Structures are given as structure tokens and as C-alpha cells.
Amino acid sequence: MRAVVVVTGLVVVVVTTTLSLQDHDVKSASSPLSSSVDQGSSGDDCDEGLPPPDQPFRVVWNHPDNCEKINLHLPLDEYGIIFNKRRVFLGEEIQTLYDTGPWPYINKTGCFINGGLPQLFNQPDNSETCKILGKNRIEDFTGLGVLDFETWRAIYSTNFGTMENYQIESVNLVRKRHPDYSEKELKMVAEQEWQEAARKIMTDKLAAGQSLMPRGYWGYYLYPRTWDSKPDTKFRNNKIDWLWRQSTGLYPSIYIYYDVVSKTDSVITKFVSDTVGEAVRVQNDFSPPNTPIYPYVMFQTMDNVFHKEDHMKISLGLSAKMGAAGVILWGSSQNYKDFTTQCSRLQ
């Protein structure tokens, strides 16, 4: 039996699901770092792995709440919710890292920062990333290490919409060198160059975290994710198998973005099932042994509207049933602009 804690507004609901060892697709091993990784150091092997599959589903708190500073106590421990000591955002249980050193990107005005494109990024070593990550280094860290970079995507073809400039400029970069190439040839070379450059940047960043805190469970927020259809999702995610082979944690997002009254249970169930299901597939096909899945979950909108209790039960309960090791309850600093009010509502 697993007790799944669902936090929704002032109510904490315990959803009980029956799970046996066979319910889990998590591979057993002594360490999530026991197999080799691509393009980076995984650090020393260790004897300590995840709890056995029949251990409680873990709910991890990742909110910048500051509630204790105003003497408002959130009794997370009473409900088995795991949190960093002193409620720091970067702590011993979880670190969601937004600053991991320089990244190439195109800003809102079209300026190329740090080269703009991964292909033009010129960083001879990982020293700056190691320096920044080292500021939050915790000796014997065995928590969740999550790198969060969302300005462009690792898979070339998924840089569409507001990210389309990355495809356009990648093609232009090839055209400057090969003006005689056909449009098809330009796009083919642009994609190849993008994938190679993005791979080096992302694996180097991941390796920096793994070398500094080798017993942590390292991966990228939003990876893996789903796309238009299951075949399309599988095809695209298989292109970055190098990322799954190096990651020792998988951190997809099952955030529900919507007017809280507008989505049906079936729509949310399909979304959660597809997203967690793809993470399980990636885990089975590529991941090092004992790599955990921790979907990111929000229990309120950016407008501070709490999600429906039934929808939270779906998000957490289905994640547990499908084999995730736990979930991460994430909260935005935007929700805490008036943290006195927010803390009172949570309490």
C-alpha cells in the first residue's frame, strides 16, 4: 500500500493505492550511477540507491515559501512531505537550478547572447558551471538535482512557435557557408549541427552537477515530454537517447495550465498518463539502473487558484500507479509575492 499525499488549498487528502513490486518499472541496482554515462563524469559509484519499490511514494516540497519567517508553520512533516531543512529552495533534498552558468540564447530583441546558437557557443571548459553549482554544493548530497533551462529545446524540430528563430538562424548559419545547398540540404545540416552542439552543452552541464554531487539524481526539468502523438513523441525522444543514458533522474512536467473549471477528468487523466508513460518508456529503454521518475506538479495556478481536489488525485495517484518514485510539488515565486497571504492560505 502507498499513501499518496495530495495537497489542495487548506485540505490534505491521502490517496491510498495498492502497488506491488510488479507495478514498478524502476530497475533495481545498487546505485543510479553504476552504469557509464556519455560525455561526462558520473562521479564515484556508491552503495546507496533508492528505497525499494515497496517503500512509500515520496512527495517533495519545492516552494520558496518563507512561511517560517513570519511564524506561520506549514506542518509538511505531519503528512510525510519531504522538504529541505530551513525550507531553503536549494537544499539537501532537492535543488532546482535555474543558474547553471552561461548558455547560448537569442533574447527578446533578437540579440545573440553567448553566441545565440548552441553551434556558436564558445566555452572551452565547464569551469564557470562548476563554480556556480559549487556554491550550493552539499557534501554527500543524495537528493534530486534538477537543471532548468527552457529558452530552447534539445530536439531541433521542437523549436517552434516562439523558439522558431533557433531553426531559422541555424539554417542561415549553414547557408552562409554553403550558398549552393538546396533548402532540404540546408535544413538537414542545420539539424545535425544543432543536435551535436546541444548535446555537448547539455551533457557538460549535467556532468558538472554529477561530478560535484555524484550521489544525487541528476536530470533536466521537462525531460522527457510528449508531443503530438505517441509515435511522434517516441521518434523525437529517441533522438536524444544520449540525454536519457546520462541522466540519473527523469523530471517531466504534469502541470495543469487552465481555468480550473474548464478541464474534464478524462482530459487530465490522458495528459498525466501520456506524460508519465513516456517517462517510464524512456526509463526502460535507455536509463541507467534505478533511475527515478519525479514528475513536477503544481497545486495552484499562477493566479493563486487552487486546483480541484479530484484533479490532484489524478496527478499524484496516477503517477504512483504508473511507477513514478514520487512527485515534486513546485511553487513559483510569483505565488509568494504576498507571502503572508499565501502562507495563511496554505496553512
Curated annotation (Swiss-Prot):
<comment type="similarity">
    <text>Belongs to the glycosyl hydrolase 56 family.</text>
</comment>
<dbReference type="Pfam" id="PF01630">
    <property type="entry name" value="Glyco_hydro_56"/>
</dbReference>
<dbReference type="InterPro" id="IPR017853">
    <property type="entry name" value="Glycoside_hydrolase_SF"/>
</dbReference>
<keyword id="KW-0964">Secreted</keyword>
<feature type="region of interest" description="Disordered">
    <location>
        <begin position="27"/>
        <end position="49"/>
    </location>
</feature>
<dbReference type="InterPro" id="IPR013785">
    <property type="entry name" value="Aldolase_TIM"/>
</dbReference>
<dbReference type="GO" id="GO:0005576">
    <property type="term" value="C:extracellular region"/>
</dbReference>
<dbReference type="GO" id="GO:0005975">
    <property type="term" value="P:carbohydrate metabolic process"/>
</dbReference>
<dbReference type="InterPro" id="IPR018155">
    <property type="entry name" value="Hyaluronidase"/>
</dbReference>
<feature type="signal peptide">
    <location>
        <begin position="1"/>
        <end position="18"/>
    </location>
</feature>
<keyword id="KW-0378">Hydrolase</keyword>
<feature type="active site" description="Proton donor">
    <location>
        <position position="150"/>
    </location>
</feature>
<dbReference type="GO" id="GO:0030214">
    <property type="term" value="P:hyaluronan catabolic process"/>
</dbReference>
<keyword id="KW-1015">Disulfide bond</keyword>
<comment type="function">
    <text>Hyaluronidase catalyzes the hydrolysis of hyaluronic acid (HA), an anionic, nonsulfated glycosaminoglycan distributed widely throughout connective, epithelial, and neural tissues. In venom, they are known to enhance diffusion of the venom by degrading the extracellular matrix.</text>
</comment>
<feature type="compositionally biased region" description="Low complexity">
    <location>
        <begin position="28"/>
        <end position="43"/>
    </location>
</feature>
<keyword id="KW-0325">Glycoprotein</keyword>
<keyword id="KW-0326">Glycosidase</keyword>
<dbReference type="GO" id="GO:0004415">
    <property type="term" value="F:hyalurononglucosaminidase activity"/>
</dbReference>
<feature type="propeptide">
    <location>
        <begin position="19"/>
        <end position="33"/>
    </location>
</feature>
<keyword id="KW-0732">Signal</keyword>
<feature type="disulfide bond">
    <location>
        <begin position="67"/>
        <end position="343"/>
    </location>
</feature>
<protein>
    <recommendedName>
        <fullName>Hyaluronidase conohyal-ad1</fullName>
        <ecNumber>3.2.1.35</ecNumber>
    </recommendedName>
</protein>
